From Swiss-Prot:
Residue ranges of domain CBS in the record: 9-66, 84-141
Source organism phylogeny: Eukaryota, Amoebozoa, Evosea, Eumycetozoa, Dictyostelia
Keyword DNA repair belongs to the record: no
PROSITE patterns: CBS
One Pfam family from the record: CBS
SMART domains in alphabetical order: CBS
Protein name as annotated: CBS domain-containing protein DDB_G0289609
Keywords: CBS domain, Repeat
Length: 145
C-alpha cells in the first residue's frame, strides 16, 4: 500500500507571520488545538516553524516573572522570529508517507511542513496523521453479514 504525503496531510493550514508576537502565537496554538505553526514571510514563503515546546521554553525562562499575566506581557515584546526554528525539515507532497515517517523519526520532530514542487507551503503532516493511518491499516474489518 503506497500512500503519498499529499493524501494524508492536513490542508487546513494555520500559519503566522515573522512579525507575530509570541503571545499571539501561543493563543493561536491553543485556539486551534495544534502543536506547531509554520512561520511565513509576507509572500507566504516558509521561513521557520515554532512549536508549543519552543513557547514553553521561552515562558519558563528564569528571567521572566512568575505571574502568568506578567509572563504574557513579556511575550508581547518578542516576535516569533526571535525563537523560531529556521529552515525547518520539510517534505514534498508526492513523497511516500513512509519517507515522512522516517524523516520525523530521524530528526525527532512531530510534524513536517509539506511543500509542492515549486517549494510553496501547502500543508502539514504530523505524527498523529501517521498514527491515524496505522490504525486504519491495522484495524480489523468487521465481517459483513
Amino acid at each position: 500500500m503506497k500512500v503519498l504525503v499529499k493524501q494524508l496531510m492536513s490542508k487546513s493550514l494555520f500559519t503566522i507571520n515573522l512579525d507575530t508576537t509570541l503571545d499571539v502565537a501561543l493563543k493561536s496554538l491553543n485556539a486551534n488545538s495544534i502543536h506547531r505553526l509554520p512561520v511565513v514571510d509576507n509572500d507566504g514563503n516558509l521561513k521557520g516553524i515554532i512549536t508549543d515546546r519552543d513557547l514553553r521554553l521561552a515562558t519558563d525562562s528564569p528571567f521572566l516573572p512568575e505571574n502568568n499575566e506578567d509572563r504574557l506581557e513579556k511575550l508581547r515584546l518578542h516576535k516569533v522570529s526571535s525563537i523560531m526554528k529556521q529552515n525547518p525539515v520539510t517534505i514534498e507532497d508526492f513523497s511516500p508517507v513512509v519517507e515522512a515517517a522516517k524523516l520525523m523519526r530521524v530528526t525527532n520532530v512531530g510534524g513536517l511542513p509539506v511543500l509542492d514542487k515549486k517549494g510553496r507551503l501547502i500543508g502539514m503532516v504530523t505524527r498523529s496523521d501517521l498514527l491515524d493511518l496505522l490504525i486504519k491499516v491495522l484495524e480489523p474489518v468487521p465481517p459483513q453479514s
